[in-house]
């Protein structure tokens, strides 16, 4: 240290300021130029004080030495270059600020002029016909008016492009010229999801350009019906791809406006229509059974119980019993309505309220029953793939969808147990499957995905199935029951032949500990003209999850209901 002090005193110091530079460990940002907190560069030292005295510790050196003449010249040159660069940057920044100010002033003047433009519907134009976007192709080169929500909007070189949505489709709308001039003021505070009425002529797009429907509306007049908020409250700030699933469920009323969610709901609507058309073709009659009941179908553990004028009642688990009652009156019957299950499991395949597509068939045996289920599924899919509305949506949602090949694979429960064990697909407890196991969802799906084709899983043990299922004549420990399994989703249909003998049904009540009194009307179906009959139920949301390649059935209904979720 004494040697360093001697060097300092021996130098011809121009300033009282002395800075220390450590090329290895110094820091221009956090250092203060002292020996204990040195700078990194001589340039920074000179920028701090141009007349300072500088000592430098080179890489690998243990001592601070006076800066060499060449190093000092180089540092001073670096300071000069940095100063020029900084001055040039400041000049450029000032010029940019001046241009921005001029542009802002010009834009303010333009907007003020736009504000004073009075836009009127063209007097010499034909009357605009109100249409839905889905009908746009039929009105090309015609003047129309279209109401809708602003799905997206952008401005480019004096043109405003709007993608308008009305629930039936999307339409590109173009505002230019005088219409743009006025709209450029009116639309400043027009956020996504604003509602507007746009007037103009629908023009087919030239080759090389694209838009929904391959046409666009050239707007000549508009009306703003309601301006949705911008800024922090803008619709686009309410939803984002990284949002938690629970938040998206809270915002489901907004989520369904998105292209994917609305596409699923449109396919759902077309699927319901296709199913009804298929039922009509199969000569089945639609009925509407009650949703408030005093009987159970699938066991008491999943019943929603409520007080019905002082009596215990339940939300229906299934309309099966009522469909059976309708057989002698109407023949083959079906219903499409909600069923309710107090499911405790939070899986992606379960809902507490779901749309249940059920049908019952008289005078059939088990083989015929399976054939009709297969026919119903395949005919419904064929109708959807021929539907001009559903087909493009299905291709958009599930590009790799292939309609199921027929016949569906028949796989008995006992053979399924063998398959699971042979392929080392274990129970949730990590054990091999055995007869009597209720095959878990994960194992069932893994097997189905490996086989990769529709499966009729048949002949389940009596002990794991419902009381009303018919036993196999020569194997009374088995039932004439079936689950239809689809790759990537698992079970979508469950059904069985029903007990047709009154004594067998009474024995089933006793075996399951069920009081037969509330079921008197169901029992009497076996008293007055019984017959072999079967029926099944299809979960619409599971069917859609398979068809539209959705991860969870919660995406396949308007507002899903499941454990702890009953809003919005």
From Swiss-Prot:
It is found in: Cytoplasm. InterPro entries: Aa-tRNA-synt_II (IPR004364), aa-tRNA-synth_II (IPR006195), aa-tRNA-synth_II/BPL/LPL (IPR045864), Asn-tRNA-ligase (IPR004522), AsnRS_N (IPR048952), Asp/Asn-tRNA-synth_IIb (IPR002312), NA-bd_OB-fold (IPR012340), NA-bd_OB_tRNA (IPR004365). It catalyses: tRNA(Asn) + L-asparagine + ATP = L-asparaginyl-tRNA(Asn) + AMP + diphosphate + H(+). The keyword Hydrolase does not apply. GO terms for cellular component: cytoplasm; cytosol. It is an enzyme of class 6 (ligase). Its EC number is 6.1.1.22. GO terms for molecular function: asparagine-tRNA ligase activity; ATP binding; nucleic acid binding. Keywords: Aminoacyl-tRNA synthetase, ATP-binding, Cytoplasm, Ligase, Nucleotide-binding, Protein biosynthesis. CDD domains: AsnRS_cyto_like_N (cd04323), AsxRS_core (cd00776). Cytosolic asparaginyl-tRNA synthetase which catalyzes the specific attachment of asparagine to its cognate tRNA. PANTHER family: ASPARAGINE--TRNA LIGASE, CYTOPLASMIC, ASPARTYL/LYSYL-TRNA SYNTHETASE. Belongs to the class-II aminoacyl-tRNA synthetase family. This is Probable asparagine--tRNA ligase, cytoplasmic. It comes from Schizosaccharomyces pombe (strain 972 / ATCC 24843) (Fission yeast). The gene is nrs1.
